[in-house]
A protein has these predicted regions:
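Cap/lid segment of the alpha/beta-hydrolase catalytic domain
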Residues: 1-59, 66-67, 73, 108-117
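Flexible loop/turn segments at secondary-structure boundaries
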Residues: 16-20, 85-88, 108-113, 140, ...
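Alpha/beta-hydrolase fold nucleophile elbow
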Residues: 70-82
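Glycine-rich nucleophile elbow surrounding the catalytic serine of serine-hydrolase chemistry
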Residues: 80-92
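Alpha/beta-hydrolase-fold serine-hydrolase catalytic core, especially in secreted/extracellular enzymes
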Residues: 144, 151-206
């Protein structure tokens, strides 16, 4: 994105990159998922959630980004892969300052996650979600008809069948709002990751 001329802010959310928390535990090395779940359990004991902390990181990052004079505040997109896709999904629902979003390798359905026995990181399912009858798509519907591209991979553990199902459900709402052209789906032909094919789909939206 930066090479294409965009102003870009890439944050290290808590428990990733330079913000790893458990440096004295070699068994956590190489996998941020361990950290997410250990810290997530600690936060639950205090009435907090890992997802809320990570979302707040993104919100405060957005505060800073929009304070920069070179940033066009009328065109602000959010994207990320895996944990970044999770963050994009939830922050997109929360933030009215965003104008487009591209979650990658997170969107599927809760049912597919259960059927595939997919272990989830602490932040991936906000407490009360299932009790409220919410699906992943509901977090995308919350900001319809904001321009959106849903990205997945054919060999991802976030089941691409669920990705397609969610996309179709969300697209119905966009259609009702007269904005079907504002939502897109790209399923790449690879494993869990932000492939060139998917990045190109995101560039075309942004």
């Amino acid at each position: 994105l930066a090479m294409k001329g965009y102003a870009v802010l890439a944050i290290d959310p808590v428990s990733q990159g330079e913000r790893l928390q458990f440096l004295d535990f070699p068994e956590f090395k190489g996998s941020c998922c361990w950290e997410h779940n250990v810290m997530g359990k600690q936060l639950l004991l205090t009435g907090e959630t890992m997802g809320a902390w990570r979302a707040w990181d993104a919100v405060r990052g957005l505060d800073y980004l929009l304070s920069r004079p070179e940033v066009d505040t009328t065109r602000v997109g959010l994207t990320g892969n895996s944990g970044g896709g999770t963050m994009t999904t939830f922050v997109n629902a929360l933030e009215d300052r965003l104008t487009m979003a591209a979650p990658s390798c997170y969107i599927t359905t809760w049912v597919h996650n259960v059927e595939n026995e997919l272990p989830a990181d602490s932040e991936q399912m906000p407490p009360g979600t299932l009790a409220a009858g919410l699906e992943m798509g509901d977090f995308l519907i919350a900001r319809a008809p904001r321009p959106l591209v849903v990205l997945g991979q054919s060999n991802d553990f976030f089941d691409p069948r669920g990705t397609r199902e969610t996309y179709e459900e969300v697209r119905k709402v966009y259609r009702l709002l007269g904005a079907e052209d504002s939502i897109r789906l790209t399923i790449g032909h690879g494993d869990h990751g932000y492939s060139k094919e998917n990045r190109e789909a995101m560039y075309s939206l942004f």
